[in-house]
Structure formats: structure tokens, C-alpha cells
């Protein structure tokens, strides 16, 4: 993000961050801990079927008996996170909202009603913590993937950006 003004040749006055699935998780973090030029320019964030908890991802993705490897997986994740970000105190248990971050900017959420990838748990966690400053839409015709665009999603997004 620091390089955006250099790449564009100007500093954007209005700026939104879009995040889908795990990208939504990163968007929540970036917008909750903004710094640099985008702190003043950020108008809001757009989350599409976002992940909201690393523990929920790991618990859902470890099949059958692999659940017994959870402590090892948590150890590896924590070690690698601390290697990349030694300055941030994020552990496995607090790698979820609200600990991960709570954006203070407006939030548009477009959630697939039948989210075959993340299920409903991430959405429920988001709704529990971010309802106050969020415009939340559950779309029955939209799958989890961002490869498919549906008319309802487009209309919601365009209307929200025009406000």
C-alpha cells in the first residue's frame, strides 16, 4: 500500500480496500491498523464472503483424524507469523475478530448465503462484532467464488460506492 502513490503518480483522495475470503481477513487487519497515506484517504472496506477467524479455518479444513495435528499446526502458524511480523503480538487464539482488528470505517459485506467454502460461522462472527458500522447483504444467488458475478451483487456494490 505504501507504494500505491508512486505507482499511480498521485495520492488517491478516496480509497477503498476490497477483500474476498482470506483477503477479507487481511482487509480487516489493514483497515483496522491503517497508517501512511491511506489512513486519511480510506473511505471504507468491501468484504465479500470474508474469513474472520484463523482458528475457524483450521478447524474446518483439517479432515477427520488430522484434527489431532491441531497443536502442531497452531505451533507452525504462530512460529511463521512471528518470523514475518515479530513486532505484532498475534497468537492462534486471537487471530480472529475482534482481536484481529475492528475497522472504524464503513463496511460493505456481501455474503454468499450458501458459502460452500467457509460455511456460516465466519459470517456469524462478523455479524456479532461488526453490525453497527456495516451494511450487510446475504445473497442467495452468489457462490463463495469471486469468479461469478451476479446482478444483485453488482447493484449493491455500485449503490454503496456512490453514496
Please report, for each region that a protein language model flagged, where it lies by residue.
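Conserved acidic catalytic loop of the alpha/beta-hydrolase fold
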Residues: 1-13
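Short beta-strand immediately N-terminal to the catalytic nucleophile in serine-hydrolase-like folds
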Residues: 14-19, 48, 110
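Residue-level signal for short, function-critical loop segments
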Residues: 21, 51, 113
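Hydrolase active-site cap/lid region
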Residues: 33-88
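Gly/Ala-rich beta-loop-alpha elbow adjacent to hydrolase catalytic centers
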Residues: 19-23, 27
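Active-site signature of alpha/beta-hydrolase-fold catalytic machinery across serine-
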Residues: 29-33, 125
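Serine-hydrolase catalytic core
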Residues: 84-162
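Core-facing hydrophobic residues within beta-strands of well-ordered domains
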Residues: 12, 41-42, 133-134
Amino acid at each position: 500500500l505504501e507504494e500505491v502513490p508512486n505507482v499511480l503518480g498521485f495520492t488517491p483522495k478516496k480509497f477503498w480496500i476490497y477483500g474476498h475470503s482470506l483477503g477479507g481477513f487481511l482487509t480487516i487487519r489493514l483497515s483496522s491498523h491503517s497508517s501512511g497515506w491511506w489512513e486519511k484517504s480510506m473511505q471504507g472496506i468491501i468484504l465479500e464472503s470474508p474469513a474472520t477467524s484463523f482458528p475457524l479455518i483450521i478447524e474446518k479444513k483439517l479432515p477427520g483424524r488430522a484434527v489431532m495435528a491441531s497443536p502442531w499446526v497452531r505451533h507452525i502458524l504462530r512460529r511463521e507469523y512471528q518470523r514475518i511480523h515479530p513486532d505484532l503480538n498475534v497468537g492462534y487464539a486471537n487471530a480472529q475478530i475482534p482481536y484481529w482488528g475492528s475497522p472504524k470505517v464503513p463496511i460493505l459485506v456481501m455474503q454468499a448465503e450458501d458459502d460452500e467454502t467457509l460455511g456460516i460461522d465466519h459470517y456469524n462472527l462478523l455479524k456479532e462484532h461488526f453490525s453497527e458500522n456495516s451494511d450487510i447483504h446475504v445473497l442467495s444467488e452468489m457462490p463463495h467464488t469471486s469468479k461469478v458475478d451476479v446482478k444483485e451483487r453488482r447493484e449493491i456494490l455500485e449503490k454503496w460506492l456512490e453514496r
